[in-house]
Amino acid sequence: MSKHFKGALIAGFALFAAAAPMLAHHSFAAEYDANKTVTVKGTINRLEWVNPHAYVFVDVKDASGKVTTWAFESLSPNALSRQGWNRNSLRQGEEVTVEGYMAKDGKPLADGSIHANSRSITRADGRKVFVGSSADEVPSK
């Protein structure tokens, strides 16, 4: 093997290794179904202000009183911060209506919550919080 070939091989491997994390990040179309919209009304159970995406967990009670937790993925904390939001913009126990899109695989997350992507969250007072990556417009705070 020539010296130049070895150098090119090592450089190519290093470039691939550096790019792998970027290639691993999912896209909306790969994980969510834009044709399967969902709207749920419930109470915020918890918020996860973590990278690469923040999550809002909402407890939804059905007619029989059974509670189901929905896990709504949103934008990154950085993107939400640039829109003027922070980890305290929504509070645990707050009543909200969430619009979003179902996960394509239909499988719950490890904690059993229903997985979806959030487009917007509407507070009880009617103010909308933009949180998703698929909305056409960003509602004002």
Predicted region positions:
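Conserved hydrophobic positions within beta-strands
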Residues: 40-44
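Short aromatic-glycine-enriched beta-strand elements
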Residues: 50-60
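Bacterial N-terminal signal peptides that target proteins for export
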Residues: 1-12
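Short boundary/loop segments of OB/S1/cold-shock single-stranded nucleic-acid-binding domains
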Residues: 23-38
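Short nucleic-acid-contacting surface segments enriched for D/E, G, S/T with interspersed K/R
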Residues: 82-98
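Bacterial N-terminal signal peptides
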Residues: 10-21
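Short, structured beta-strand/loop micro-motifs enriched in basic residues and often containing a Trp
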Residues: 74-82
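OB-fold/S1-family single-stranded nucleic acid-binding modules
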Residues: 103-133
